[in-house]
Design a protein with these regions (language model features):
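Extended active-site neighborhood of metal-dependent phosphoesterases/phosphodiesterases
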Residues: 1-56, 68
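Histidine-centered active-site/metal-ligand motif
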Residues: 1-5, 82, 104-106
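Beta-strand-turn-beta hairpins that frame and shape the catalytic cleft
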Residues: 26-27, 33-45, 69-78, 135-141, ...
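Fold-independent oxyanion-binding glycine-rich loops
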Residues: 31-32, 48, 82-83, 161-162
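Conserved beta-sheet core of the metallophosphoesterase superfamily
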Residues: 84-180
Length: 187
């Protein structure tokens, strides 16, 4: 059936999927803040809805809290966004995020061996379309060097290439699908 005349693809049942995830304990970070506890440590989360669709609205800081200060007792603040647009990344860094997790780019999807992504499908530099770098980017970080994020004004950025492809370009070239498992350890 033609549920979406723009793409001729069926509309995904995202609301039902979200409701099932929430029932299972998932955190909905669409334009929200929340916390989780892992190994007895509090982790602060801040997220936005899909910036590619202009659905993002950076969540306000609660009265009496400092954006960079974060949740009381949190050991780390993690920003989560589907699409790593620069405006969102800048807001997350200004908010005190130390790590930002993103997707959307499919790793560039069409890459050249030895060069990498040709495009990022957002305003992120193509060299940052997948993997770990820093934001704001340093020259070394976007060329896969070991540039550490500073304590203030910079965050680690991890963009997953993901498993799928764009419905408009359903092929990958020199860009393997990936599911990422990150392990965070104390400094």
């Amino acid at each position: 059936s033609n549920d979406d005349p723009v793409t001729d693809l069926p509309v995904l049942p995202w609301e039902e999927v979200r409701d099932m995830q929430l029932a299972g304990g998932w955190k909905d970070l669409d334009n929200c803040r929340d916390t989780v506890e892992a190994a007895g440590q509090l982790i602060e989360l801040v997220g936005v809805a899909d910036a590619h669709a202009d659905d993002d609205a950076f969540p306000e800081v609660a009265a009496g809290e400092s954006a960079a200060g974060g949740a009381s007792g949190a050991v780390v603040k993690i920003g989560v966004t589907h699409a790593p647009y620069q405006r969102v990344l800048d807001q997350m860094v200004a908010d005190g995020a130390q790590l930002i997790l993103a997707g959307h780019t499919h790793g560039g999807q069409l890459c050249l061996p030895g060069y990498g992504a040709l495009v990022s499908n957002c305003d992120l530099p193509p060299a940052q379309a997948s993997g770990l770098s820093t934001w704001p980017a340093s020259f070394k970080a976007i060329h896969k060097g070991a540039a550490p994020a500073s304590e203030e004004g910079q965050a680690y950025l991890h963009v997953s290439a993901g498993l799928g492809t764009s419905p408009f370009t359903p092929v990958r070239t020199a860009c393997r699908p990936e599911a990422t498992l990150l392990t965070l350890t104390a400094r």
